[in-house]
Amino acid sequence: MTEITFKGGPIHLKGQQINEGDFAPDFTVLDNDLNQVTLADYAGKKKLISVVPSIDTGVCDQQTRKFNSEASKEEGIVLTISADLPFAQKRWCASAGLDNVITLSDHRDLSFGENYGVVMEELRLLARAVFVLDADNKVVYKEIVSEGTDFPDFDAALAAYKNI
């Protein structure tokens, strides 16, 4: 089991760890209208998956805005996944004035978190992470942020996304 910190305290990550070069496992999450969504729904497109503990926090808000602003300039898709309820994600999108942001909720089964090794066991939230997948769902970049309240390496993730 991998360990990170969150606000300085130790947190254990559970789930299957994936690495660069692996093919990304499938997952089932919910969109803002409670429809089931899987990785297969985005087949044939490169993907930047931004994982946040809660969309309602300052760091998560900034991470979501930054990746959507920068990566949306490229061909492909940006997904933001958290364990927030779909209603909270929908409210955040509306209050942020962002209609092109795709937020997905892993609250029900933690399917994404378990399959990508980012479930913070003690908090039942997802750890801050970034995964970049090519159009065939091969993982070309992975970062699990070692301190959950820190930002990911935006430059490295965006460079990996742009270079696919």
Swiss-Prot record:
Organism encoding this protein: Staphylococcus aureus (strain MRSA252)
InterPro entries: Redoxin (IPR013740), Thioredoxin-like_sf (IPR036249), Thioredoxin_domain (IPR013766), TPX (IPR002065), Tpx_CS (IPR018219), Tpx_Peroxidase_subfamily (IPR050455)
Name recorded for this polypeptide: Thiol peroxidase
Signal sequence segment: none
Coiled coil feature spans: none
HAMAP family (alphabetical): Tpx
UniProt-annotated catalytic positions: 60 (cysteine sulfenic acid (-soh) intermediate)
Name of the gene this protein is made from: tpx
Span of domain Thioredoxin: 18-163
GO MF term set: thioredoxin peroxidase activity
Species classification: Bacteria, Bacillati, Bacillota, Bacilli, Bacillales
Function description: Thiol-specific peroxidase that catalyzes the reduction of hydrogen peroxide and organic hydroperoxides to water and alcohols, respectively. Plays a role in cell protection against oxidative stress by detoxifying peroxides.
Gene3D superfamilies in alphabetical order: Glutaredoxin (3.40.30.10)
SUPFAM superfamilies in the cross-refs: Thioredoxin-like (SSF52833)
Pfam family, one: Redoxin
